[in-house]
Amino acid sequence: MCEVDGCRSVPALFRRRVADLGEKVALREKDFGIWNEYSWADYGQRARWAGLGLKALGMERGDVCSIASEVNKEWLFADLGVICAGGVTNGVYPTDAPEQVEYLVNDSGTRFYFAEDEEQLDKLLAVRERTPTLEKIVIFDMKGLRHLDDPMCLSFDDLLERGRKYAAEHPGAWDEEIDRAQPGDLMVLTYTSGTTGPPKGSMITQSNMLFMMNVLQRCYGVFESDEQLGFLPLAHVAGRMFYTFLALESGSVVNLTESPETMEQDLREVAPSVHFAVPRVWEKQHSSVQIKLKEATALGRWAYSVAIRVGERRAEFLKARAHVPGWLEAAFAAADRLVLRNIRRGLGIDSCRWLSTAAAPIAPELIDWYWALGKPMYEVYGQTECSGIATANLADDFRIGSVGKATPGAEVRLSDQDEILIRSPGVIQGYWNKPEKTAETIRGDWLHTGDVGRIDAEGFVYVVDRMKDIIITAGGKNITPSEIENQLKFSAYITDAVVVGDRRPYLTCLVMIDAENVTQFAQDNGVPFTNYTSLCHTREVQDLIASEIESVNAKFARVETIKKFRLIDQLLDPEDEELTPTQKLKRKVVNEKYADLIDSMYRGG
């Protein structure tokens, strides 16, 4: 039975944290440039009123409540309010289109829906006639909606007031609901963003997440004194795992960004002590440094070159768990004082004990770069279907390029087809309303991940690629596209790429350029353009990307090299169907939508 501090449910643990930590800071939220603090007592009171407000509106145990919002305190108050009152929370990405919202509400059977603001409300209202289970909509930010007159809608403040009154009339109701929580209760629905097919709702129980809290604590150690930056979407399992549940386990402080656009500045201001991010964030940081170097003086570039080489040499000893010679430590101290520390401060990671990455493939060279800067980065691996992570690189047991060994309590093995299989108390109950998909994915207690991998003699797991993404060329050669794509994304000028070549005579790729860095390149080199599309079609940008691809080709065998490429000349954001909410290109959608562009690279052979 999974427990945290003697608590067998998340509601019981939340009640304990509120009682024990009281006036200590639990959350900070940036609003108009000011960081406002909220104590554990504040957190507990608002979650209590939110949960009891829903009870006053008729919510029953097991009812699904969906939340569509950017990362903010109301998301967290509503989340734990729903869970403690016996409901089930389901995160909706604020970038989802009305049709996606309709699907999620109907598939989950949502009765109560939290909308961040007018924009999120409008998306739901556009489809509400086709969402028969929906009963009430709660709005966090009423800006522009003060004159809204709709019996289905109420403000979050109104919900809290209803909860306050309900608490006064039923003084024992909150504790009664918390005491009713059982380890096997469904607590969270997390819909996989997925690169193919409609999203599937992973059913995460109380015990699933308690197990994951224990795993994260045993792997990394997070404490009350630690600071996190909350910026990842809470509809994603990683955001929930760190900002709701790991914070609850550890008592650490979560600092919520003002908006996605202010994330980089907020990171510098908060200077967190522990920091998890997806590869795209790390790639963007690396790219920003590379671009600044191009604009630096010759002396500045020389100083960086010397400093990073010293950092790389020192990192070799650290990664080998070997003693660093005194002369090298002295050289690193000088390099750190003059160059590397300033880079870390500029990125906002100088105070971090460790950095962690997951949710997509990452180039090992990028991890090496952070080690050279003086910050260890550890790659972990898991899926929504195992409630978080199943393998991890640890401070005293890691191998760069791998995703680490099985975490405590988890088992990892390979099938006859080299598919990675996971068995652990974190594996979900199944997919909501999809027994056939559940039976396909979870067989004999083993989660079939859909990832091809290998496991070395010491137990380190290596993820090769998604099984469905392996390319078999017309010549019969098996190609791992993600390995090539990771190297392409290491370029400061490439945000993402999709390698194509299944049953084709050679490999090609579609490239999504880094708009900011390529625009800077064009301005620095006097390249005329009028918009993003025209920028992509300039000869200079085409040559720039061709040069980047040639550099990557030099690292691979001839059959694995990119022969032709095309640029995706539309500026994409997470609201576009080509991108997942974590900013990964959806391979299937890209292949279908840009079929003519792909075919053009094979005409004439």
PLM segments and residue spans:
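Conserved AMP-binding/adenylate-forming core of the ANL superfamily
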Residues: 6, 26-80, 97-102, 152-160, ...
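Conserved pre-ATP/AMP-binding loop-to-beta segment of ANL
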Residues: 22-25, 139, 153-154, 161-191, ...
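Conserved AMP-binding A3 loop
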Residues: 37-41, 157, 179-180, 187-213
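Structural core segment of the AMP-binding/adenylate-forming
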Residues: 84-162, 544, 550
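Conserved ATP-dependent adenylate/AMP-binding module captured primarily in the ANL superfamily
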Residues: 96-126, 212-229, 260-274, 346
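Conserved AMP-binding/adenylation subdomain of ANL enzymes
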Residues: 210-227, 234-340, 351
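Conserved ATP-binding/catalytic segment of the ANL
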Residues: 406-473, 490
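Conserved C-terminal "lid"/linker of ANL adenylate-forming enzymes
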Residues: 496-499, 549-605
